[in-house]
Amino acid sequence: MIGINKMIIQRTELYTTTGVVKSTIHGNIINISFNRNIQYQYRQISNKNKNRNLSPRVLNLKEKGTARVTKLNKNRKKGMRVVQKKDILNAKLNVQTPIVVEEIKNISFASQMVHKEHDNLPTLRSKQRMLLKAYFDQLRINNLKAVNNIFTLKKRVLNLKSNYLIVTYSPKGTKVNKANVLQQLLKYKQYFTKKWAFKLKARVTKTNFIKTQIALEKQKVRNIAQPCYISLNQKINKKLQKLQKQKLVLTSKAKLQRFKKQRYLFLKSQSKLDIDLLLIELKKKARQSKIKYKRRTKKKVKSVKVIEELKDFVALEEEMEAYYKTPVETIMSSIVTKYTENAKPLILKNLQQKLRVKEYLQYSQIRRLIDITNEKELYKNKELSKRNEKKLKKSIQQKFLKTVVIAVNHKKNQQKDSKKELIIKVLLNILRRKGEVPFEGKIDMVLPYLKELGRKQDDAKMNNLALNLQMRIVTDLLNYKGDTEVKNNHVALVRKRIDYLNYMSQNPRRSRNAGPRSDYKVIGKAKYQGKMMYAKLTEQRKMLENVALKNNYNILNNIIESEKKLYKLRLPKQRVTVPTLYQIYERVINHIKGFERKTQGVYSKAKKFQNILTKLQAIKRNKKGTIKKRRLKKAQEETTAPVTIPLTQGVLRITLKKKNMFLVLQNLSTKHIDTTVTARQEYYRIYNPKEIDPLEKKKKQALKLTALKPLGPIGRVIGTDLFRRRVITQVLLNLKAQIKYNVLDIEIRKPGFHSIINTILYKLWYIYEDQGLLRMYKFTKNKAHGSMRKKKHRRL
């Protein structure tokens, strides 16, 4: 990389709609200057707030009116001027460095404009530094190796005559790092980029491409026979190759717009409609029923190493070889052939159907735990599944023969019958226990046994679907054998949903706000709820073909009603039946082979078999052979809509997941940790500052316990969900919080001062179970502690 001397000046210009932002490097110092003519917005700061306890209250000027603006202009002691985030979004950058620098988003700098005659200048400068640290903490620039935590403001900020607001900071590290400070800062990228930022680049590439193409055609016509122009044509071909590469980069970035999910996706143009997020906004009722049910019936999932083959089968083969040497070999062979010929094809079909369901569930769980890019781990899982199929085929036959051999040898000494008669008696006794002998004279034991298996397998498939509520595919519902009307209605609605999504992707929205920063205007108002916003947008969509306002609104309501029916359909009220010997034996194999996975640690063989034996003993105690009907809990019944409680003094309760105790800033799609701060570091930084401060004391011993190595490069993705989490971390820093029984209780004494909590509760800043880690609970009034029965449920 290029080393920087004191004489060299490196400059970047950031063109926006309103003004220019510059930055220059003089040796160790970097100056970032903002134009004063940029649109700004006011934030109130109270004098009580000290030591980084800032709770700014954003004023939307369009809602409150211009009268508030004049007051704030007079009182400049309280009002401060801020470069708005809108102006820095999607800006075009041109840096004079060999490495390409990507675009900035979610960066907000702040500085305070004051009269010259103001007395307390040092106090103002201290406030300015605190604000800068707060905004740079949002970007996690403190964790960069090259940047120092110290920021200093120049005196030019206080002069109203100057046209620029200047911020300086001194980087820390070697010369190479000093040169790359700005690059490291700009590596905080984001997928979303607006149209107008790329059109400028696209136009330039098109015009250059056309000019070079015309020049080539002319040279090919004129200079066919002249060999001296060959070198010139080669140069032009290289230029064409570069331009084509630039096109590929632009198209790949444009494709990311379509596949990236965001909360207000249906407001943006050129994007598919994500109904799952929209349903949560429209109906809080459906959302609560989902969450409450998931907490109870969710399987604990974790990868477990597959145990080796059982040693019992080796001993069994030795017994069988010794047994077949006897002259009764001819008698046994006739029965064994009958069993294998009839049973093999039917057992294989049933096993394949079961293994398909298990593999589908297994791989859906592995995708969360393992990165799909690691092909080795997936390849291993495929090989293991093939081995397990072979083991199951062998084990069923050998287990059956083992039971027959043991029974015959046991009764041989007691009775005087021949071996053939003894074998028939043993087989009939096995079938009588299950009630599977229609006619006692016949020995056809296979077909009735497998007919019952086919029925019970259909029930097993439905139970597997009930456990995984995330599967919403039409093909999975076809296996259900129940109310045909309910099923057909849902299949039709799912097809309507797919057609609707395809139509919306072909005909994007063309609204009045469809310019740059359209979604910020809509979100800033926050007047309308989800229903009203959707109805408002459908009025603008009347001109499109084959879609009207009523059709759009009815489709969504039908989908909501169908999902309610679906949950009832997937969770039928049935009595629990006693499992057969085949099912019990199958469960034993599943425990051994590792199909059923658990979250915490690897259990030993003894514990697994002990759990199975306890279940078998409980079944034996029931004389009738039936387990009592399990009572449905109140959560499964239909609940009324929740009442919005106003903010008062009390406790805000938030439940935390078991895996990650606090905030883990991690994308599930890319598996990259967004920042070096992990769950334990955040926990210790907020709740145990005296014991460990890993961000300040950068020691190896402290970081070994807390730090996790990031999987990706330094530059990582920042999304809207992450931005919301950081807002919540600011709330937790400002308020008194306490963790107990995986529940985080936040005390609120003066609700008027905490405007961010209003936004969390009333603007629906929820963080979902899949994407985020917090879940908002109800807001009680001075009732932090419930009954002991509730506390036991929280200790999961």
Swiss-Prot record:
Chief place of localization: mitochondrion
This protein's UniProt keywords: Mitochondrion
Entry superkingdom: Eukaryota
Subcellular location field: Mitochondrion
Keyword Mitochondrion belongs to the record: yes
Note: Found in a 14.5 kb cluster region located downstream from rpl11 gene and upstream of orf796.
Name of the protein in its database record: Uncharacterized mitochondrial protein Mp36
Gene source species: Dictyostelium discoideum
Lineage per the UniProt record: Eukaryota, Amoebozoa, Evosea, Eumycetozoa, Dictyostelia
